[in-house]
């Protein structure tokens, strides 16, 4: 996405806007045409099409094209815009699973942490590692990855092995401007999409993938040692 937030001050008398901060709205592979609205309780909500013209517009065998992102609440804090899933999503939380202070070395899975329609928060509270990856929509053949590469100060989202058309855009690499030792990722996983809200919505990554729904495993991969807290809810719409 090339859509940007411009934060600053506006002088009504001179009709001049003074730019103070510029930030990307979404760093993922599929994000287009965002719009905002204001709710009755004065929240600013953003919605957009989760699709890119560089991606496969219409999945083979399907009668739909792209999808909408989950509506996001926008807030300004310390001169920057933070994004978070609308709070109403919590009304659809079911089957909560929690783990605290779990050690991740190599490849790990946790009982109850799987699925294709869910809301999961991962806190990396400590440890010593160069790379940490969360693989979703996974089976023996397919997976989509979100990676923190601390030694390169870089974030990556990679759907190369999701079963997508090979010539489509598959990897997005983003420089982490404020490297840190503690990370918080909130991942909204839908049947054919993933939205990652990094560090309370300082950065957001949206991507589609068209992996078979039978691929529902989630793995955590660390090249050193990481201490993580996990909280996961299925999203169930009656």
List each model region and its residues.
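Active-site neighborhood of glycoside hydrolase catalytic domains
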Residues: 1-21
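Beta-rich accessory regions
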Residues: 12, 19-238
């Amino acid at each position: 996405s090339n859509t940007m937030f411009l934060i600053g001050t506006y002088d009504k008398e001179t009709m001049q806007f003074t730019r103070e901060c510029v930030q990307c709205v979404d760093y993922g592979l599929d994000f287009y045409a965002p719009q905002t609205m204001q709710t009755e309780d004065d929240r600013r909500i953003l919605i957009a099409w989760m699709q890119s013209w560089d991606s496969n517009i219409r999945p083979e065998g399907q009668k739909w094209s792209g999808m909408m992102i989950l509506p996001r609440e926008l807030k300004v804090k310390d001169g920057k815009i933070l994004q978070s899933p609308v709070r109403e999503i919590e009304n659809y939380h079911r089957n909560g699973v929690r783990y605290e202070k779990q050690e991740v070395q190599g490849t790990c899975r946790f009982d109850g942490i799987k699925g294709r329609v869910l809301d999961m928060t991962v806190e990396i509270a400590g440890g010593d590692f160069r790379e940490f990856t969360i693989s979703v929509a996974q089976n023996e053949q397919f997976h989509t990855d979100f990676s923190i590469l601390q030694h390169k100060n870089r974030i990556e989202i990679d759907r190369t092995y999701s079963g997508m058309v090979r010539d489509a855009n598959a990897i997005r690499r983003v420089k982490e401007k404020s490297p840190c030792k503690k990370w918080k990722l909130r991942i909204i996983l839908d049947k054919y999409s993933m939205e990652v809200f990094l560090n309370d919505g300082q950065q957001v990554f949206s991507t589609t993938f068209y992996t078979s729904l039978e691929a529902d495993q989630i793995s955590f991969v660390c090249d050193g040692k990481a201490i993580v807290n996990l909280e996961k809810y299925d999203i169930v719409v009656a």
